[in-house]
Amino acid sequence: MLQSISHVALVVNDPARTAALFEDLFDARRVQRQDDEGHLETFVRLGGVWIALVGAPVQRARTGDHIAFQATPDIIEATVAKLERMGREFIRARSNRALYFFDYDDHVFELNTEDIPAD
């Protein structure tokens, strides 16, 4: 039986810059290490999930694909204020119960206040 998500890997142009975005927005924990083949790996921890930031050239079209984190209304409002100060694009949705924002490589992240029903 599966236990939990180990990590989510995202290909990004600049792992350090993307990690800094999450550090600035959420005080995310950043870990860098070398793998067995000597490649530098960058991870950030968001909402209990490790995000692996894989450095490679990337151009993404915006689709409906996204990673969503549950958050309180206060966290959403604080994130909006930070995104505005940073000049980052974001979209409010569902009567302000959800917030979508984009990293530097157009990956979409959602913060929402709604629970997914158990059944």
Question: Which residue stretches match the model-derived regions?
Answer:
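Vicinal oxygen chelate
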Residues: 31, 80-81, 85-119
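Core segments of cupin and vicinal oxygen chelate
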Residues: 2, 9-51
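Short, conserved charged micro-motifs
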Residues: 17, 74-79
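N-terminal beta-strand motif that seeds the catalytic metal site of vicinal oxygen chelate
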Residues: 1-17, 64-67, 71, 117-119
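Short aromatic/hydrophobic contact patches that present stacked aromatics
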Residues: 7-9, 43, 50, 66-68, ...
